[in-house]
Amino acid sequence: MSIEVSNESGIDVSEEELISVARFVIEKMNVNPAAELSMVLLDTSSMADLHMRWMDLPGPTDVMSFPMDELEPGGRPDAPEPGPAMLGDIVLCPEFAAKQAETAGHSLGHELALLTVHGVLHLLGYDHAEPDEEKEMFALQRELLEEWVAHQVEAYHLDRQTERDRRLLDKSRYFDE
């Protein structure tokens, strides 16, 4: 799976974290591992231009998704007929997202992870134009984000335990000499 990130926003964000959450969602949704995804981070001015050009709406927004093909919800490029290798593009605006994060009371990293999940789901055919679609998409979005956060916490604790074990083993070797 190939995920490329191009940060043109001027704001320092963890590209590794964005790739991690996108990869997690793509794997959880059983998307063919050969799929490719592009993520672009823009400043508010560039995002406002894109928002007007594609959605005919003024001002910047937090996330926009540009799927390569229109898919039905649940329709994914699965094997044996994987469909398009390129899922599409997700465009994020960290400056706009930072304001939303502050209002919501969480970090920019958390907000960008949420928006990445949201963007990937749009690429996979999910939408929230109708109330029933919104309920389905937002429930799945919440579930996937919670699972990713739990996975990150578990990986952190495993890394810490591995480091403690390594230090303990190093000390025991020291005393054996």
Curated annotation (Swiss-Prot):
Listed cofactors: Zn(2+)
Source organism, top-level taxon: Bacteria
InterPro entries, sorted: MetalPrtase_cat_dom_sf_prd (IPR023091), YbeY (IPR002036), YbeY_CS (IPR020549)
The enzyme's E.C. designation: 3.1.-.-
PANTHER family tied to this protein: ENDORIBONUCLEASE YBEY, CHLOROPLASTIC
Keyword entries, A-Z: Cytoplasm, Endonuclease, Hydrolase, Metal-binding, Nuclease, Ribosome biogenesis, rRNA processing, Zinc
Pfam families documented for this protein: YbeY
Disulfide topology: none
Protein name: Endoribonuclease YbeY
Compartments (UniProt record): Cytoplasm
Family affiliation: Belongs to the endoribonuclease YbeY family.
A Gene Ontology biological process term: rRNA processing
A GO cellular component entry from the record: cytoplasm
GO molecular function, one term: metalloendopeptidase activity
Cofactor note: Binds 1 zinc ion.
Function: Single strand-specific metallo-endoribonuclease involved in late-stage 70S ribosome quality control and in maturation of the 3' terminus of the 16S rRNA.
Species assigned in the record: Mycobacterium sp. (strain KMS)
Amino-acid positions noted as binding Zn(2+) in the UniProt annotation, renumbered to this chain: 118, 122, 128
